[in-house]
Amino acid sequence: MKQKQWITVAIITMALTLTSCGTIKKSANTVGATTTPVTTTEKVEASKDFISIEEAIDMVENPEKIASITKKYGYKLKENYEIYRLDKFSKMYYKNCRLAKILTAGKYEDYPKPLQKGVSSYVAFQDGAVIIGVFNQSAYDNLVAQVKAASFVLDMPGNEDVYKKDNRTIGCNEGLKTVRVQ
């Protein structure tokens, strides 16, 4: 008798489990409905501690403005900054940074290093491009927000997200916290 009760309870439990696990599938027919992605750009205020994207674009288009823009932010200049076997920059402006250790004549060990006080950043010039490097995530996020607010569209995501607008290209590398304007 007890065995029949256990079998009955097991069958009822299994029946309830199997019938309650199903989901109701709803399908709708959308005829002629097309969706277009809507991009909303918010007004982003550029940080007053380092160069804005607008100013970087201006420096690429008008190289004669480089000195006045970098002076406004208090950047120091180091010409012909070369990172040993890696990169070479015609001009390296840095602020709240110290230059890396010199390995050989005019060749440095690495990019400039941040100081603990203030927002550290550098602006490097290489083959017609301006590279803005920052050292904290909020400063990098501000730069990327400026790129998006300037109506640049993500063209190629990856290690360096490439944004395009007309013939202007901006690459944002989150790992290095750099923004390259060409």
Tell where the protein language model's regions lie, with residue ranges.
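Bacterial N-terminal signal peptides that target proteins for export
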Residues: 1-10
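C-terminal motif of bacterial Sec signal peptides marking the signal peptidase cleavage site
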Residues: 17-20
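Bacterial signal peptide processing site
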Residues: 22-25
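Post-signal peptide N-terminal segment of mature Sec-exported envelope proteins
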Residues: 29-53
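Amphipathic alpha-helical segments
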Residues: 58-79, 136-156
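Ser/Thr-rich, low-complexity intrinsically disordered terminal regions
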Residues: 81-98, 160-168
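Long, charged/polar, surface-exposed segments that mediate recognition or autoinhibition
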Residues: 93-160
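Short, exposed beta-strand-loop hairpins at the edges of beta-sheets
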Residues: 157-175, 179-181
